[in-house]
C-alpha cells in the first residue's frame, strides 16, 4: 500500500475513534437509551412539580412525596405491547419490596401520557388490572398538556402518535427525596431494580 494512503487510513481511523469516544461519552453510550441513562446520572435533573389526576379523580403533586423516594413509569391504558410487560414488572417490584419501605420510604406512580382517553374510569380499570392499591402505588395522568410535555422532556420519554396508539420508549424512573431524577432502570430487569432499591432505600 502506498505510504500516503496508509497514513491517511491510520489518520482517519484515529479521527473516527476520537469522535466516537467523544460522542459516546467515553465509549459508554452506544444507543440513545444508554446516553439518556448516563445523562441522568450526571445531571440529576429536578422533576417538574406537575399536577397529576389519579384513578379516583383526585389531584396531587410530587411535592406531597418530599422526603421520600418515588419510582415512576409511563404508559397508556390501551397499549397492547410493551406497556403490559412494564406494568407487570412494576407489580413484581412492588410486590417484592418490604411493606415497611412501601409505607414509609417509597411510592410508586404509573403515569399515563394519554390524558384524553385515560379518564379516571380507565385509570381505575388499569389499577385493578395490575393490582395497584391506589395509595402507595397510584395510577395517574397529567391533564395539562404543557405540564405533560415538560415532564416527558425532562425524563427523555419519546412519544410518537401512530394509528390507534403511540410508539414510545419505556423504563422505570427513580426520583430521590429532593425531587431529582437520579436513576433510569431497564423495565426488563425487575429483579435488579428490587436489589438496587433494597440497598438504596432503607
Residue map of PLM features:
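Sec/Tat-exported extracytoplasmic proteins
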Residues: 69, 94-101, 130, 152-159, ...
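Short extracytoplasmic
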Residues: 37-70
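Structural microenvironment flanking redox-active thiols in thiol-disulfide oxidoreductases
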Residues: 87-151
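Extracytoplasmic
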Residues: 45-47, 65-69, 103-106, 118, ...
Amino acid at each position: 500500500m502506498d505510504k500516503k494512503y496508509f497514513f491517511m487510513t491510520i489518520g482517519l481511523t484515529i479521527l473516527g475513534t476520537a469522535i466516537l469516544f467523544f460522542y459516546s461519552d467515553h465509549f459508554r453510550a452506544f444507543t440513545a437509551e444508554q446516553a439518556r441513562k448516563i445523562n441522568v446520572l450526571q445531571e440529576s435533573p429536578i422533576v417538574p412539580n406537575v399536577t397529576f389526576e389519579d384513578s379516583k379523580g383526585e389531584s396531587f403533586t410530587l411535592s406531597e412525596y418530599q422526603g421520600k423516594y418515588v419510582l415512576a413509569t409511563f404508559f397508556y391504558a390501551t397499549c397492547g405491547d410493551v406497556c403490559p410487560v412494564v406494568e407487570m414488572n412494576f407489580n413484581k417490584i412492588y410486590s417484592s419490596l418490604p411493606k415497611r419501605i412501601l409505607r414509609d420510604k417509597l411510592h410508586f406512580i404509573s403515569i399515563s401520557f394519554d390524558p384524553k382517553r385515560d379518564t379516571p374510569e380507565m385509570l381505575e380499570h388499569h389499577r385493578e388490572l395490575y393490582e395497584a392499591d391506589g395509595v402507595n402505588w397510584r395510577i395517574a395522568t397529567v391533564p395539562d398538556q404543557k405540564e405533560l410535555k415538560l415532564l416527558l422532556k425532562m425524563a427523555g420519554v419519546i412519544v410518537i402518535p401512530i394509528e390507534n396508539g403511540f410508539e414510545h420508549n419505556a423504563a422505570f424512573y427513580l426520583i430521590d427525596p429532593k425531587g431529582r431524577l437520579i436513576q433510569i432502570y431497564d423495565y426488563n430487569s425487575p429483579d435488579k431494580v428490587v436489589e438496587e432499591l433494597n440497598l438504596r432505600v432503607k
